[in-house]
Amino acid sequence: MPFINIKITKEEGKVVSVEQKKALIDGVSNLLVDVLGKNKASIVVIIDEIDPDNYGLGGKTITQVRRGE
């Protein structure tokens, strides 16, 4: 059973819509079917939306990085 976890940082003023999430889930599932020959019914896809204060890069939060700090 393939397990795919997509992590997306939340962006100020932008929301990932339900339609976009459905498209991600379907698209990633189809990719595994096409490339790896997996059964679509067995593919698990989870989307985590991460607060930019809870994600770091280069010793700074993503919020700081986006502000240019």
PLM features: residue spans?
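A domain-level signal for the structural core that forms small-molecule/cofactor-binding pockets
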Residues: 1-69
